[in-house]
Amino acid sequence: MKKIKWILILGLLPLLMPVLVILILASAMAGGSIGGNSSVQKGVTYSEHWSNGDAYTHNLLVHRYGIKASQLDGFLKTLGINYDSSRINGEKLLEWEAKSNLDIRAILAIALNESSLGTAGVATNPGANMFGYGAFDSNPENANNFNDEVAVVALTQQTIIGNKNQTFKIQDDKAKKLASGTLNTTVDGGVSFTDTSGSGKRRAETMQKLDTYIDENGGTPKAPKQTAGKTRDGGGITSSDIPEGYSLT
């Protein structure tokens, strides 16, 4: 009888897999709602500006479509920081966004507020990262074990998704709960930072400044609408890959 039960369970696995995948994706996006103006392309969710009305409550796994490296470089130069442009620049930020699935505006905001774009604190050590990943209050030098690229991917998977920190507001709220002794890490997940002075709010303000700069310097096209069943002949692009207002000719 037990053998028959196992055969039945194994036979049902292929049918259950799609449901499990949907549940996993839904869990990853939990903690920050996504507005009705969102679009999904190749597994990446886009919103015109913010997923939930403003940068502070924005889901950090939702992106603004079509941001250019030149726009990012232009914004970085307005900050008045003598940063290493070979270490952080528009092209690298775009690469980090693609590898981590973290909103590029959040990546820049975290780097700025954690280490002034890698120019302050432990981030100046050889091999350390500019995002504060691994820099525990009790052992900040631990950040030396994670370079920038490794850190931004791990930060997204562990800190943002695994510990349910999908918005900067959630991160601020959890830091306050930790300080007051009311944080239930089993339910709420761990904190992104322990500072209670409004670190999340400041990061959101940086995101908003970058978003405004982009608007004032060329803007971005609207994300392509989600399509079902499209095909690619010979690996080329299709008309559904082209942003609104653009064409293949």
Feature annotation, model-predicted:
Residues 14-18, 22-23, 34-106, 117-243:
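Catalytic cores of secreted/periplasmic lytic hydrolases that degrade extracellular macromolecules
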Residues 1-18:
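N-terminal Sec-pathway targeting helices
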Residues 26-30:
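Intrinsically disordered, compositionally biased low-complexity regions
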Residues 249:
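SH3/SH3-like beta-barrel superfamily modules
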